[in-house]
Structure formats: C-alpha cells, structure tokens
C-alpha cells in the first residue's frame, strides 16, 4: 500500500509540474532587461508608406503596379524629426504591408522598390529610415506582414514560409539592431504559418529584439496589442497576462493613427487629424496606464510628412512637456521617508521593508498646493508588485482618497478634480512582495496653461 501511494504521489507531482498554472505565481513573473528598457521609451511612431499612398487605398490588394511608387522628395530625417518632436524614442517602419510591396530591394521578389522608378530602382527606404533613426538617437524596428496578397506562394504554406524566412533574413541582418519586430495577424484567414521557426530565425539574427503580436499570436509575443486602435488601454492594465495557459510578462503597446480614419496618407483627410486634446487624452490613457503609445505617421506622395501633421506632433510634444514640467513634490515637498520615490529621478527607487505587504509614501508641503494629477511609477525589474493603492490627502483630521486603483506598472497617471492640501500620501494597500516605487509625483494641469 505504501508503495502504491508513493507511486501515485510521484505521478501527481509530475502532472503538477506539467501544468503551467500550478508552478506559476503572478509575483514570480519578471520582465527581461530588454522589456524594462523598452517600457522606459514610452512613446513610439510607426510609418505607413507604399503604393497605397499613391492610390488612395488603405489595404492594398497586391495588384498595384510598382511604377506608381515614385516619391520625388523622400526625407527620412524629416520623418524622424517629426516623430521625435512628439516625444517618440523609437520608430517602426512598415517594410511590407499586406499588399506585399517591399520597401527594400529584396532578392526574393521583384514586387517592390527595385521595380519602381524611384531612384531608378536602386532605392532602399528601409535603409534610409533606419539610418535616419540612428542619426537622430531613436531606436528602430520593422513591421513585416505575414499576410501577402501579391505573392502566389502564399497559397502554398511550405513555399511561402521559405519566402518569409528569406525576407526575414534580409531585414534582420542588414539594418542594425532592431528594437521591435511587428507581426500583424490581420487578414491571414486559415493560412497556417510556422511561427516557431519564424521566431527562431528572427532570434538567430536579433537575439534582443522584442516581438509585438496581436491576439492571435500572443504565444510568440514579448509585447501585446491592446485590442483597439484608439491609443488607449483600460484603467487597470497589468503587465503579467495569461493568454495561452501560462503567465508571461507582456507589456502593452497602444497604437493609433495621427489621422483618425487612416494609417496611410489620403488626400483631403486633414479634418481627421487628432486634436492636441485628443492626443493628450491618448497619452494619459496609454503611457499613463502603464502602456506604450504608438502614433501612426503617414508621409504623403512627395515622401514628406505633411506640414499640418508635423505641427500637430510638435504641439502634442510641447503639451506633454508643459503639463508634466512642474513636479510639485520635487519643487515644494518634503518627505518623511521614502526620499528616493520623491526625488524626481526615475533612475532611483524606494524599497518598502522586506516582507511587507503594505506601505506608505508620504509628502508634506510648507504651504497647501493645488493639484489634479498624480504620477506613480514602479521599479519593474522586480516585477509588478502593487495590487491595490490609493492617493490620499489629509483633510479635516483624516486621510481622504482622491484616487483609487489596482495596477500601477511602469507609470500610472491618476486624474481627478483639483484638490488643495498640505499633506499627501500614496497608500500601497496591497502588494505581492515588498513594494518598489521609482516615483510619486504631483502636478497641476492649470500650471501648463
């Protein structure tokens, strides 16, 4: 009987080891160094440019003649400067969209810039944008659509996989370090890709690149789509998610086009340009909820970002800078403890006592201050530890909450009606492990006007 019981125990332990959730705990999931660095970038830009730009299309069907692609004045440095003015620290170029048209001279197909009149068929737009990004201090990434509406090999999965592998080799080996590699699952229908080999091939060339994928491809993702193209995420946004039966660190990227209706440039579309107010809302509901904001920028048929778009990007960048220029905690506050969380330096952090499951960061002011925004940042190297928190002010002899939440993550911006107080605290009501707080900051939006 003892032997039988022991055997069953061994089998049970073996089965538990095979069951992913049994061995996993939310608090045990940590990001890679690359993910931590990526989350610090906060804002990115993605460029859509191709034959669709010249044909007033959004999704090309793969039938466009390459001769339509002939921009007379491509200025990749201008593209990058426009993105940088908005606060972007990385860019992604759509090297091949669903229509199959290649913005680099691929040796595997004639359907691309090498068959166009642009630069006599000798141009390489991927190289131009990559080099411009690096010149201007931005990181560079590539979008390579799995769906290809032009190439006949697409209807034969093994042949198309070889084609896709080859294009991946070209892009991953020629243009320097890639910060991000976008895989878009749109439109593929019943086509079956060998994604295991695709990722293996990518890692051979780019071991540190981060893979972005939408819902259908979460298994392969280091970064995840938020499920919309509005540039916003839910108020509670967790970096640790379960999409395939196991927990994994998958920070979110919230993408949205600068012109609300389209990703590619279209004539007479200026009216859909997002306002500064809308863009600030996107920022506070993406970056301000622990995600990245990815802005879609569409160069026109000249190969330039339209002037009105450039101005809007500049206005947005200026507006973010002004709204978050004056951290009242750093400028006017005095802490009782936790000074590393109040020093305005995201490179430092305050650690709650080991073993604690609740902690408080408190700040006092000599005179009452008025504020309507609280910014909190976790030190994510050790994981996302805060599970419940409140921002509180001391009023009429007791602490009163002005904001309550659960997830903090990389950055949480809580927005509330203006409040005036001399004592403010961040009450970390529930944590999984001792909290690690990089920053607790207070701002008044009125000061930016």
Name these PLM-found stretches.
Residues 389-391:
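Short beta-strand elements bearing conserved aromatic residues within extracellular beta-rich modules
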